[in-house]
Amino acid sequence: MIDLKMKNILSLTLLLLASLSAAKTEDALLIIDVRTPAEWDRGHLPNAKHIEWQNIGEEISELTSDKQSTIYVYCRSGNRSAKAKLILEQLGYSNVINAGGLRQAQSFIDSKT
């Protein structure tokens, strides 16, 4: 039996897959890694940008000022990306998707290429 947490993870993964599939090109995607610099240095998704979750409110305007643009955030497990999503939504960004952990996001990107 699938517990509620796993069901939520599956739902978010399916939402991410559908949203990314709708994107015109991979270059059009704004993917932000919100992990620490040390985690970033150990590996990150291709084309991802790096902003630590606690700095996302101050630094997001360097990447986009379009509050309607779709923004994907990820971390190691999905917890910090959930915090980053909340911060961005409080700033008025309306299309923010928590892509969860690095492995989840990487699996999808690999399937596209």
Where are these regions (language model features)?
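Rhodanese-like catalytic fold shared by cysteine-dependent sulfurtransferases
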Residues: I2-D3, K7-I9, T25-L30, P37-T70, ...
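Short helix-onset patch at the extreme N-terminus, typifying the N->h transition
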Residues: S11-T13
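Hydrophobic h-region of N-terminal signal peptides that target proteins for export
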Residues: L15-A22
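Short, surface-exposed ligand- or partner-binding patches at beta-edge/loop junctions that are enriched
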Residues: Y74
